[in-house]
Regions:
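Interfacial loop-to-helix junctions that mark the boundaries of transmembrane helices
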Residues: 9-17, 34-39, 65-83, 111, ...
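Hydrophobic mid-bilayer segments of alpha-helices in multi-pass membrane transport proteins
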Residues: 18-29, 36-63, 80-92, 233-243, ...
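Short helix-coil transition sites and intra-membrane helix breaks within transmembrane domains
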Residues: 36-39, 93-101, 127-139, 167-175, ...
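Cytoplasmic-side transmembrane-helix entry/capping segments in multi-pass membrane proteins
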Residues: 40-49, 106-119, 152-162, 285-298, ...
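Hydrophobic transmembrane alpha-helices that form the pore/transport pathway of multi-pass ion
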Residues: 115-169, 180-184, 337-352, 377-380
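Transmembrane helical segments that form the transport core of multi-pass membrane transport proteins
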Residues: 240-345, 426-427
Length: 428
């Protein structure tokens, strides 16, 4: 995809025609890739640099100086708080799931070779179709932790993230971006077409990842003796998930406009976690690490919202393919919002692209960041790309399969005509 930025007004500082904000954002991403042991510090420094530049030089989209910053945060706080509460809440949920000892009985039903590891990815894929992809990835990570004796290959971790994002790409309940499409008026069946590409993609990346994992640490062949499932803890897991699903459905069906006014889903998960304390104590010890990872992701997301991107190239399958690669480093929520504003996309193709595309780098999706909090060794772009090479291949193959089998059927623009080039906002 040929992404171009329109002519920069003289009042907007730029380097070789590229706004300074993009340069600062790119420098932050490079820093995260190079200094993977200090990702939070790099992200916070990058955020401070972008905010400082907007504050003192260009102003914000909502206005200059402090008033503009406050107005911008007022627009974004619901999304940020939802992400924060979901990341921390689902981290506690995944620990509940692991301690329920359900993963310890999985050897009863899973094959005892690489096919067992692949079946686990399919389970994550299915879970993500009706759960949030963050929860599906963390549950998958908890199962892998037990089944592979806490030795999980980075390539397999990348596949877990890919499975969770693929499973959510065709469901209006499985991912934030598809829920945004649903709220905006896109029909669920139009989004469902994404599963054509997602199914091919999970096969392409799942088999190599499963073989990687089996060679690295074979799956348990026998369940632990005298395993007794903690049923009350299972009930806690079901209760928290039910709260999230019910809130998501009720808000988006009955009062979709309210979803932008308060972080209902995140708050419902937090309340469910607190209410379940009377049944089983959550593993509060993991909260600091979960919060650290959440703040890192929120820093990236917030930086992305400050970028002066107002328009996308014309809606086409080439644009959708490119947006998938962009979503690996640029938050897919604002990309999806811009695409909805523009209209004219095949929403199934776009849902697959921005959903699965974020799996190519560990911080490209909220599911990847959440899982990396459990497996810190995965916080390396180089190792993720090296061992998770099959995810990038799967994205391209899955996209091609989606176009070949389902075709490109764009919907008529429903938000008015939008130009076909990137434009630069002065923020004033």
């Amino acid at each position: 995809m040929n992404l171009t930025i329109g002519p920069t007004p003289a009042t907007v500082p730029a380097l070789l025609g590229v706004p300074i904000e993009f340069i600062l954002f790119a420098a932050m991403l490079v820093g995260v890739a190079l200094f993977h042991r200090h990702t939070l510090r790099v992200a916070l420094i990058g955020l401070a640099a972008v905010v400082g530049y907007k504050f003192f030089v260009t102003g914000f989209k909502a206005g200059p100086s402090f008033d503009g910053l406050v107005a911008h945060m007022h627009q974004e706080w619901v999304m940020l708080m939802n992400l924060f509460l979901l990341l921390v809440g689902f981290a506690l949920l995944s620990r509940h799931f692991e301690k329920s000892r359900i993963p310890a009985v999985l050897p009863r039903i899973l094959p005892h070779d690489w096919k067992g590891a692949f079946c686990l990815l399919v389970i994550v894929f299915v879970l993500s179709s009706f759960l949030d992809n963050i929860a599906a990835a963390l549950v998958g990570g908890a199962m892998a932790h037990t089944l592979f004796r806490a030795k999980v290959h980075i390539g397999y971790l990348a596949a877990i993230v890919a499975a969770s994002n693929a499973g959510g790409s065709g469901s209006v309940l499985g991912d934030t971006t598809t829920t945004m499409m649903w709220v905006d008026g896109v029909q669920p069946l139009d989004v469902f077409r994404a599963y054509t590409g997602a199914s091919v993609a999970i096969l392409v990346c799942g088999v190599p990842a499963a073989i990687q994992q089996q060679r690295y640490s074979p799956i348990l062949k026998h369940e632990h003796k005298y395993v007794q499932v903690d049923l009350p803890r299972v009930g806690v897991v079901v209760f928290i998930l039910a709260a999230a699903i019910a809130t998501n459905v009720m808000i988006n069906l009955r009062s979709p406009g309210l979803s932008h006014s308060f972080p209902f889903i995140g708050a419902s998960v937090a309340c469910a976690v607190l209410m379940s304390v009377v049944v089983r104590r959550p593993d509060w010890e993991i909260v600091p690490a979960a919060m650290k990872g959440s703040i890192f992701l929120l820093s990236l997301v917030l930086c992305a919202t400050f970028m002066p991107v107002e328009r996308l190239p014309g809606a086409s399958w080439q644009t959708a393919l490119g947006l998938g690669f962009v979503s690996a480093v640029f938050d897919n929520i604002p990309l999806t919002a811009l695409a909805l504003k523009q209209g004219g996309y095949d929403w199934g193709v776009l849902a697959y692209a921005v959903g699965f595309g974020g799996s190519m780098i560990w911080f490209g999706s909220s599911a990847g960041v959440a899982l990396s909090n459990t497996y810190p060794e995965s916080k390396s772009v180089i190792l993720w790309l090296k061992h998770g090479w099959h995810v990038t291949v799967a994205y391209v193959v899955g996209f091609g399969a989606l176009l070949f089998i389902a075709g490109w059927y764009p919907n008529a623009p429903h938000k008015g005509e939008i130009g076909v080039s990137w434009s630069v906002s002065t923020g004033r």
